[in-house]
């Protein structure tokens, strides 16, 4: 069965209100990558982030809750010590709120950060997702640099071309942000289009799962 892995970045509240109910209805799994951004950003925008209660509900519903750092910093520009602190802070936040220790990670902003790999391995992560528009080939791709397609805007052909690359052994990983996105309009996706995309996956008999589901299969 062809596999598509759904990932959602930045803990946007619309993922809880709009995305998760539809995924539950369709029987789809997904990974939600959580960050908190910096204090100044949160002071203005915290209402657009999921709360601990909402994260716990997603976890109870069987979705994967994963680490996207605390401040959403571009890791290539920081030392291992700073990276480790970012990862520890987010792990602690999740576990203090009743979420299991994360096993998946996503690089903020998308680019692979080689300087983060040793830190991720020390903290027992199974995989780390970057963003580059190609399918994941387990035989050749490093699990600490998973490729993924960023799905946003209004381009159904891009979505269809992305999922067409999936097969039983080589899943396609998709990255979404807000549906809709309230603060970062360049990664916005309309709910009607998201619903259309999920219908394509359902009608196409794709296996739709989280990163954790794939790596712990």
What are the functions of these language-model segments?
Residues 2-14:
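Boundary/entry segment of secreted carbohydrate-active catalytic domains
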Residues 3, 24-126, 134-146, 169-181:
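Metal-dependent polysaccharide deacetylase catalytic core of the NodB/CE4 family, i.e.
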Residues 7, 67, 127-129, 133, ...:
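Glycan-processing catalytic domains of CAZymes
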Residues 10-13, 108-112, 151-154:
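Short beta->alpha connector loops
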Residues 15-16, 51, 83, 87, ...:
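Aromatic/hydrophobic pocket-lining residues that form the small-molecule binding cavity
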Residues 16-23:
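Histidine-anchored nucleotide/phosphate-binding helix
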Residues 151-213:
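Catalytic grooves of carbohydrate-active enzymes
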